[in-house]
Swiss-Prot record:
It comes from the Bacteria. GO terms for molecular function: structural constituent of ribosome. It comes from Helicobacter hepaticus (strain ATCC 51449 / 3B1). Belongs to the bacterial ribosomal protein bS21 family. The gene is rpsU. One of its GO terms (biological process) is translation. This is Small ribosomal subunit protein bS21. NCBIfam families: S21p. Coiled coil: none annotated. Keywords: Ribonucleoprotein, Ribosomal protein.
């Protein structure tokens, strides 16, 4: 569970920003959203396939972009 130590000199906005960054890093919000509704195994697999395809296309794009600079 995320938690931060606030210094006396820190403002509320700075402390809130730190807390928000920590929750984003720990994927707390995304996990809660994912568990909000039941997801069947087929839906999970479908999402995993879509994410894998996106990741592959992103890597391919980055590789082509890198090669074009050479």
């Amino acid at each position: 569970m995320p938690g931060i130590k606030v210094k006396e000199s820190e403002s509320f906005e700075e402390a809130y920003r730190k807390f928000k960054k920590q929750t984003d890093r720990n994927l707390v919000v995304t996990e809660v959203r994912a568990r909000r509704f039941f997801e069947s195994k087929t839906e999970k697999r479908k999402k995993q396939k879509i994410n894998a395809k996106k990741k592959m296309l992103k890597r391919l794009y980055m590789l082509r972009r890198y090669e074009s600079k050479l």
